[in-house]
Each structure stands twice: as C-alpha cells, then as structure tokens.
Swiss-Prot record:
GO BP term (any one): spermidine biosynthetic process
UniProt family annotation: Belongs to the Orn/Lys/Arg decarboxylase class-II family. NspC subfamily.
Protein name: Carboxynorspermidine/carboxyspermidine decarboxylase
Subunit structure, as described in the record: Homodimer.
Keywords of this entry: Cytoplasm, Decarboxylase, Lyase, Polyamine biosynthesis, Pyridoxal phosphate, Spermidine biosynthesis
Catalysed reaction equations from the record: carboxynorspermidine + H(+) = norspermidine + CO2; carboxyspermidine + H(+) = spermidine + CO2
Superkingdom: Bacteria
Organism: Vibrio alginolyticus
Length: 377
C-alpha cells in the first residue's frame, strides 16, 4: 500500500517522527527522574500505543472512558482526573486507576471513601499563575474553575491526600518561564508539598520543541523533587505527537471571489477543530512562502468562515491535487465529529520500514449510529 493509493481525507502518523519525540522524552526522564504519563485528552489513537509504551510510564485522563482506554490499551500507571466527577464515574474507575485526582475539596470530601485503599488520592491546586498564549486555554484565567485557589485551601486537607496536580502551561517553549513557575509553586505551597508523595506539573511543557534545553528542564525538576521529597510527574500530550502527523486532503474545486479558494475534502469544523477554535492557521507541506500563487485553503463544510489557512504556492493548484496539512495529531482525532455528514478521515501509521498500516476507518453506518440507534414508536 502506497500513500498515493489511500483515499482522502486521512491522517498519516509517521513512526520515525514519533520515536524522535519519544527519545527526547526518554532523555528528560533520565536526567530528572520524572515520570511521564500520556495525556489522552490530546491524543488517544491507541493503535500506536505499542510504539509509545516503552518510553512513557502510563496515561492520564480527563473523563471515565479515557481512564478505561488507558488501562486497557496502554497499561503502566493509570491516572484519573476530572473537572467534575459523578459518583458513577468514580465507582466506574476506582478499581482500575492508580491515582485519582479531584478538582475541588468538595469532590474530594464527597468521594474519597470510594477510592481509599484502591488508589492514591490527589487534589488539583491552582497557583494563580500560568503560561498560556490564549485566555481560552489559561487555567489561571479570571473566575477559573480549575483546581483549588491558594486562599481557599484547608491546610488539614494535606494530611489526607498523597499528591497534588498543577496544570498551568499551554505550549510553553520557554524553559526559564517554566522554572519560574516551579519556583513560585515551591514558595507558595512548599510547606504542603513536603507532606506529600508525588506532585504532577501537568502538561503544556514543550520539551520536544527544536532547541529546547532539556537538560536545564530536567535538572530543575530533579532539584524540585529532591527539595520536597516527592516523585515528579509531567503529563505530555502534544509534546509526544507534535510534527508526527499529516492530514492528507484533496483539492475538489477552485473558486474565485477576489481571492482564489481551493476547496478540499475536509473541514476544520469536523476534522481539525482547534484551527477554528483558536484561530490558528494550519501549515501546508506543499506551500512556499515566496510562491507567486496565493490560495485560501477552504473546507467543504457549510460554515462560511471554515478555512484551514491562506498559503502561497510555486505553481497553480489543480483539482485532484493532494495537500498535506502538517502537525495534525494533537486535539484532532479526539475531537472528530460528523458535522455536515462529511466523510471521516481514516487513520494510518507509516512504519519505520515503509509499511503503511490502517488503524481506523469510518463509513455511513458510523455516521448514522452516532445520531440515533432507535426510532420513536
């Protein structure tokens, strides 16, 4: 099977690029002693977990089905966290998770009796500081519901928990900024951390970014762990799968209204939602910054503003031409939806030996079932 034989749209995960990121993760672990758990909210394509497992320590989840998926398909440590648990959620996962992290002191009080003796118990804290490029993704934004604020903490709570989680970064490429956050947490919560077994610093630390000083990060994490006598965790998601995956699409039409728009057989609304939510234009492999031919890369959905990007090309685009939308693994496959009844992208993995293996495909029956399974009588 060759790439040009695959029917678009589809995601193509490259094993070599994935391993390149994982080797950086291993380097960080070796320097720091930190444990890394994959954030399934970002990437849950379990068909490639056998590639990832040797490098990471387990998974972390944001909902009960992610907990079950991590337990069944990844193994290692299974961390369960939710912004808001129901009692059924807690009971469903208490027997299969290694750590259960509550978002509030009230949820901790309500459900800890279900978890005690089964899993290590943690609490999410909100230090009121963060590193996030957009307010939508900022855990320390005004009126944040994420974690317990410092001035709301009941000190006695730390006598009955094993660890805490801070998640305050989003695409933080600045190691010094992260170390500054570590120092702020140590100063603000140090007396509490000294009583605990583990601390998770969450995700969003972009240690796989080109040129990132992994050694400096690792030594800072190691120093923090030694100072407070805790096992440190990070929860990478996009850091593991960044630049590993293309969304491959085909130009199905070209229209002109002042600008030329190449319409492709995919949509941000359905297949690459964060492009739309965060207004972050996609990048196209075939584009050229100095190309003379400019096109809007538009989707085939009915949403007027649904477009991937504006890009320049050396040669005019043609109907039937394929384009590779780069870096399309994070928060894409986990957010796929059936808007407009569009064809759902298949998922493939390009192995190191050149083989292409199918991981998932969808058809009309999947679309129909997602809408109803039974009719009114």
């Amino acid at each position: 099977m060759q790439q040009n034989e695959l029917k678009t749209p589809y995601f193509s995960i490259n094993e070599d690029k994935l391993i390149e990121n994982l080797e950086k993760a291993k380097q960080l672990k070796d320097i720091s002693g930190v444990k890394l758990v994959l954030a399934l909210k970002c990437f849950s394509t379990w068909g490639v977990f056998d590639i990832i497992k040797p490098y990471l320590d387990g998974t972390t989840s944001s909902g009960p089905f992610e907990v079950k998926l991590g337990y069944e398909t990844f193994g290692g440590e299974t961390h369960a966290y939710s912004v808001g648990y129901s009692e059924d959620d807690v009971r469903d996962v208490a027997d299969i998770c290694d750590k259960m992290i509550f978002n509030s002191q009230s949820q901790l009080a309500a459900y800890r009796h279900i978890v005690e003796g089964k899993a290590s118990i943690g609490l999410r804290l909100n230090p009121g500081v963060s590193y996030a490029g957009q307010d939508l993704a900022n855990p320390a934004r005004q009126f944040s519901r994420l974690g317990v604020q410092a001035d709301h903490i009941k000190p006695e709570i730390f006598d009955g928990i094993d660890g805490v989680m801070f998640h305050m970064n989003c695409e933080n490429k600045d190691v010094d900024a992260f170390i500054g956050l570590l120092d702020a947490i140590s100063a603000q919560f140090g007396e509490y951390l000294d009583k605990l077994d583990w601390v998770s610093m969450g995700g969003g630390v972009f240690f796989t970014w080109p040129g990132y000083d992994i050694e400096k990060l690792g030594l800072a994490l190691k120093a923090f762990a030694e100072k407070h006598g805790v096992q440190m965790y990070l929860e990478p998601g996009e850091r593991i799968i960044t630049k590993t995956t293309d969304l491959v699409v085909t130009v199905v039409d070209i229209v002109e209204n002042v600008k030329k728009t190449a319409i492709v057989d995919s949509a941000t609304e359905a297949h690459r939602l964060d492009t739309l939510i965060y207004n972050e234009p996609a990048s196209i492999l075939e584009a050229s910054e100095n190309g003379e031919h400019e096109y809007v890369i538009g989707s085939c959905s009915c949403l007027a503003g649904d477009q991937f990007c504006v890009a320049n090309f050396e040669q005019p685009l043609e109907i039937g031409q394929r384009l590779h939308i780069l870096d399309s693994a994070g928060y894409t496959m986990v957010k796929l939806n059936w808007f407009n009844g569009l064809r759902m992208p298949s998922v493939y993995c390009e192995r190191s030996n050149g083989d292409i293996q199918k991981l998932n495909e969808f058809d009309y029956s999947d679309f129909k079932r997602s809408l109803s399974q039974w009719s009114v009588i």
